[in-house]
């Protein structure tokens, strides 16, 4: 598919190829080393820059170790090192696999690109040696990256996400299978089949779940990924997901039980509080974060 796209549209129309490991918008699914390597070969063939969004790179390395032949006996950091060997650029929100509350990272192989990038960082964030972060945050990042790449930690974290999936199975709750690394993604349209995408079934589920059990989740569907074309026609994604992201080192399996039971009751009742949501504001590219919605009460 990738090579066909490049051949159809031309190399000059492709600024770069970006791989998200793991992918936050499709259920937190991992990318195999074979896939990463194959895309690298295509990018090299056509001279296209290969970029990694690697916020959850250690979770991805864990799945490679668990599932991909030839990696069972390799260390998480060793696997991560091989992953990064295929990319030209990597950027990371360190708040994810770095286990901290602030910080990010940009790395590249091209010295010229680096020399052009870091002055902007200094203008907007801080000097390249600290990026506007306090010393304590830099120390936390150093520790977090080390602990976040420990196999025992990853096994426990991802095991908790898998436990939530197993509990949801008991209630027949529909979600993206298999569960990924950072959370469980619920199929909102199967909760509310009568609510059209334009009335945001994912947001309705998020609101219902919060009112029922005080559980806060994120919609990744019509609100996040719909867009207006040049003619003003709104296009909606094929699925409406609600992400139940599991915070690191915070919850016990008892909390997972509460989530599963609340979702199970909502799914089995088949009676949402809403007929849908109306978007009262539209803010273009940032709409998912900044728009306001009005509930259409039953």
Task: Kindly label every feature range from the protein language model.
Residues 38, 42-45, 163, 167-171, ...:
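Generic non-transmembrane alpha-helical segments
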Residues 115, 193-201, 249-258:
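Short, conserved charged micro-motifs
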Residues 161-162, 176-188:
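Conserved glycine-rich beta-strand-loop-beta hairpin in the small C-terminal domain of fold type I
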Residues 161, 189-216, 230-237:
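Active-site loop ensemble at the mouth of alpha/beta enzyme cores that anchors a bound cofactor
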Residues 108-116, 136, 211-238:
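Flexible glycine/proline-rich, aromatic-decorated loop/lid segments
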